[in-house]
From Swiss-Prot:
Residues 368-383, 400-416 have a biased composition (Acidic residues). GO terms for biological process: primary miRNA processing. Residues 8-77, 294-329, 337-355, 389-399, 417-443 have a biased composition (Basic and acidic residues). InterPro entries: Nucleotide-bd_a/b_plait_sf, SE/Ars2, SERRATE/Ars2_C, SERRATE/Ars2_N. This is Serrate RNA effector molecule homolog. The lineage of its organism: Eukaryota, Metazoa, Chordata, Craniata, Vertebrata. Belongs to the ARS2 family. It comes from the Eukaryota. Residues 1-92, 268-450, 607-628, 850-877 are annotated as: Disordered. Acts as a mediator between the cap-binding complex (CBC) and the primary microRNAs (miRNAs) processing machinery during cell proliferation. Contributes to the stability and delivery of capped primary miRNA transcripts to the primary miRNA processing complex, thereby playing a role in RNA-mediated gene silencing (RNAi) by miRNAs. Independently of its activity on miRNAs, necessary and sufficient to promote neural stem cell self-renewal. Does so by directly binding SOX2 promoter and positively regulating its transcription.
């Protein structure tokens, strides 16, 4: 189908449009833009076609004031290429150009990168969108209400511009330091006011809620300590070492600890001796499939049903009971919906016997009706044959027969009633016996160490934990909710785990929660998978005797620091703790110094001769480390493993992974992962490898030793620490209003007084709750201020302008612009990830108040990724740079 005449004329007019002056006709073209040609052509080939024209005039609209130099191309080397349509002029509705026309400082421009030549144009939308507004998902970033951008601290150069010329250098430095302190103080106060009503912030710094949270954490720690002492007293750690070969035994110990933490008894620990759920499923499927076949084979024929109705009923009742038991087992042991369908599959043919029984009952009743009709017909025939007899004798004969039949029926009914009474008594006796047997048997162990859980990626900071608990408590098997620490780079959104009992249908619960919103925040839950590898290994060099001794020293030091911080052994134990008597010092640290002292045979070496030892020492000093074999000391291994189990179970610290698992008591798996020693290296190791391992490991362990840092008094005063008495005085003055001469008002109660001193006395006496709130608010703010690691908005630093040589891609380098920092939109709006090659850069940093969108920044970073090196836009300066190059030379860089 050809284009219309108007379209053909327009194309003829535009044929030589490049030779016209952009400066003269730029405004006319703004009014006479092309139609949206994206609808007329396949979108999948849009960027491929545009790739050919990127080498010359793609960025012309970003500098409309300039005039380009056009010269006729040379055709002796290659034929003339067809000039493509400029379908990128109209940016309406295009997410890449949506924020281009924003004013200076208006929203920071679009966040998406320019079109990548290797990806689909819609690929930028393929990203997790949990918690991101719908405008961001549709590409209209400039329509999002992200609030005002946070202020950016001025550089010293920018600050000097605002100063008078008469200010000398020392004074300017002094004023700039004051400006920085004022800026940080104001930023901190704004952050406090913005987040002080959010649950995560109050639970961290508010005096009431922080104290409650600390008490809960301490009680949970005491519970964990009691579990560890129970396991140690019952010799659970005796025959187990933290080696990767003992992974099943290590997992069993962790599961036993979880069962005890959940309040399990001795009987519940027996479930660890039973086969796992997978083995039970196989056995259940095999046992469920075999009995179903004989039941089908042994189905009685219709002729037999008349003879054996009672036996068939008994069989049917037994089958229904077994089906119910199988269904209960399946519901108790299943974890996922797919598994449940497999488990319930053997129970599907069960309704068929019910239908058969109904048909058989109908058949029985039909047979009785046929018999009755047959007897009636027989009686009719008899009456017809005996019609010659008189009617009176027949009536006389019928009367005694009817009386006899009634008597027989009454006798049968009495016998049936007696039989029913006897059967009822028997069933009651059987039930009582079964109850006694059940009471005598121990209760079935519960799988307290296995759970099902849902994961919610983005929970808004305004949503409290109580709201999620109230929402999920409606579903059976609900246990607990865990919310992670807020992520400043993601607008302080939190991740959430909701834990349920193992016997629930977790996929059904997940489906029911799919479309539920809390305060305009989509929960978007997903089923959380079980942990794949709970026991993971590190380098086998950790089995060396020297490394083991160093690990004992570090672990003992860490245990001592954590116990002192949490005051586990210094105070008297509470009544509710499982361990009634706790010694003043941790028993596992007793005589620990005996294993930290290294024993050497120096005298023996001296007597036998120091030649060999001297040579080895000289060799090590010269930088030629000697190779040694890994020596394992079982005594050191046993002592170290006891310490590492203590760290993992009590303090939730994975020693070999050098990390702490926060909020583990609220997570679905309370003792999920542990890292252990790997197999012994097959080759010999060097002393340098041992020393390097110890050095790097100690550096990684450093953050675990660090105590909570607080600001000094001087720094706190500079940052604006508040005094409770002064704040109370300000509160009283603010609530003392003068209405007129000798008329003063207390706005809190509406009462009037003759003087301000009476209002003050009234507030202090009658509004003590308000005064306490003011004091708590002061403590709240000071707690936040004194935290040296307090949360804050991520500081946005402008990227450094590239030098003249940084914009040009070298032939030997990567065909990508330099790596830019992962910037944020608005208040921590997450940046979409790059959907291209793995080695490519992220999208360019989006600055607050970014002028004409984000393209000027990107031009300063080397143009589009994969753009040929003859591009003219690899600079940050908007002015043209005159360059001299051979126009006939082919492009020497072809990335695709």
């Amino acid at each position: 189908m050809g284009d219309s005449d108007d379209e053909y004329d327009r194309r003829r007019r535009d044929k030589f449009r490049r030779e016209r002056s952009d400066y003269d006709r730029s405004r006319e073209r703004e009014d006479r833009r092309r139609d949206d040609w994206n609808d007329r052509r396949p979108s999948a080939r849009e960027w491929d076609r545009g790739r050919e024209r990127r080498s010359r005039g793609e960025y012309r609209d970003y500098d409309r004031g300039r005039r380009e130099r056009f010269s006729p191309p040379r055709h002796d080397m290659s034929p003339q290429q067809k000039r493509m349509r400029r379908d990128w002029d109209d940016h309406g509705g295009d997410p890449y150009h949506g924020g281009y026309d924003l004013g200076y400082g208006g929203g920071g421009g679009p966040s998406y990168a320019p079109p990548q030549p290797w990806g689909h144009p819609d690929m930028h939308l393929m990203q997790p969108h949990h918690g991101i507004p719908i405008q961001a998902r549709l590409g209209n970033i400039h329509d999002m209400d992200l609030g005002p951008p946070p202020p950016v601290m001025k550089t010293f150069k920018e600050f000097l511009i605002s100063l008078d010329d008469s200010v000398d250098e020392t004074e300017s430095v002094k004023r700039y330091n004051e400006y920085k302190i004022d800026f940080r103080r104001q930023q901190m106060q704004d952050f406090f006011l913005a987040h002080k009503d959010e649950e995560w912030f109050r639970s961290k710094y508010h005096p009431d809620e922080a104290g409650r949270r600390k008490a809960e954490a301490h009680s949970a720690l005491q519970n964990r300590l009691g579990v560890y002492m129970y396991l140690m007293d019952n010799n659970w750690f005796e025959s187990v070492s933290l080696d990767i070969e003992r992974a099943p035994q290590i997992t069993k110990i962790l599961d036993a600890a979880v069962i005890k933490m959940e309040g399990g008894a001795e009987n519940d620990l027996r479930i660890l001796e039973q086969p796992s759920e997978e083995e039970e499923e196989r056995e259940r499927l095999s046992s469920g499939g075999t009995p179903s076949e004989p039941s089908k084979r042994d189905e009685p024929k219709p002729a037999d049903t008349e003879n054996k109705p009672s036996e068939e009923k008994d069989k049917m009742e037994e089958g229904e009971e077994s089906a119910e038991k199988d269904g209960e087992k399946a519901s108790a042991g299943g974890s996922e919906g797919e598994e449940k369908t497999e488990k319930e599959a053997p129970a599907e043919p069960i309704p068929e016997p019910k239908k058969l029984s109904k048909k058989r009952k109908r058949k029985h009743s039909g047979d009785s009706e046929d018999e009755a009709s047959a007897s009636e017909s027989e009686s009719d025939s008899d009456s017809d044959s005996n019609s010659h007899c008189s009617e009176k004798p027949s009536e006389r004969e019928r009367e005694p027969e009817e009386v006899e039949e009634k008597e027989e029926e009454e006798e049968e009914e009495g016998e049936a009633a007696d039989g029913k009474e006897q059967t009822d008594e028997q069933t009651e006796r059987e039930k009582e016996k079964e109850k006694k047997v059940k009471d005598d048997q121990p209760p079935r162990p519960r799988p307290l160490h296995r759970t099902c859980s849902l994961f919610m990626r983005s929970i808004a900071p305004t949503i409290s934990k109580a709201e999620i608990v109230a929402l999920c408590r409606r579903y059976p098997g609900f246990m607990r909710v865990c919310l992670s620490e807020p992520q400043p780079e993601r607008r302080f959104f939190r991740r959430c785990w909701v834990t349920f009992d193992r016997g629930v249908n977790i996929k059904e619960i997940c489906w029911n929660l799919q479309n539920i919103r809390l305060r305009d925040c989509e929960l978007a839950p997903g089923v959380n998978r079980d942990l794949a590898r709970r026991v993971r290994n590190v380098n086998g060099i950790t089995q060396h005797k020297q490394v083991l001794r160093n690990d004992i020293k570090l672990a003992a030091k860490l245990i001592h620091a954590l116990d002192d911080r949490e005051k586990l052994w210094s105070q008297k134990p509470r009544e509710e703790t499982p361990t009634l008597e706790l010694p003043a010092q941790n028993p596992i640290l007793k005589n620990i110094t005996d294993y930290l002292i290294e024993e050497v045979s120096a005298e023996e070496e001296e007597l036998l001769g120091s030649a060999g030892g001297g040579d080895s020492e000289d060799g090590s000093k010269e930088g030629n480390p000697t190779e040694i074999t890994v020596e394992r000391d079982e005594k050191l291994v046993k002592v170290l493993d006891r310490l590492l189990f203590y760290l993992r179970i009590v303090h939730s610290i994975d020693y070999y992974n050098t990390c702490e698992y926060p909020s583990e008591d609220e997570m679905p798996n309370r003792c999920g992962i542990i890292h252990v020693r790997g197999p012994i290296p097959p080759n010999r190791i060097t002393l340098r490898e041992v020393s390097d391992w110890q050095k790097t490991f100690e550096e990684k362990m450093g953050p675990l030793f660090s105590v909570k840092e607080n600001l000094s008094e001087d720094e706190a005063a500079k940052m604006g620490r508040k005094d409770p008495e002064q704040e109370v005085e300000k509160f009283v003055v603010a609530n003392t209003q003068e209405l007129g001469k000798d008329k003063w008002l207390c706005p809190l109660s509406g009462k009037k007084f003759k003087g301000p001193e009476f209002v003050r006395k009234h507030i202090l006496n009658k509004h003590g709750d308000k005064i306490e709130e003011v004091k708590k608010e002061v403590v709240f703010f000071n707690n936040f201020l004194m935290d040296a690691k307090r949360p804050c908005i991520p500081e946005m630093k402008p990227p450094p302008h590239p030098g003249p040589g940084q914009g040009v891609l070298s032939p030997g380098g990567l065909p990508f612009p330099p790596q830019g920092p992962q910037g944020l939109m608005g208040f921590g709006q997450p940046r979409p990830p790059l959907m291209g090659y793995g080695g490519g850069p992220p999208y360019p940093p989006n600055q607050y108040g970014g002028g004409r969108g984000n393209y000027d920044n990107f031009r300063g970073q080397g143009g589009y990724p994969g753009k040929p090196r003859n591009s003219r836009v690899m600079r940050g300066d908007p002015r043209n740079i005159i360059e001299y190059r051979d126009l006939d030379a082919p492009d020497d860089v072809d990335f695709f």
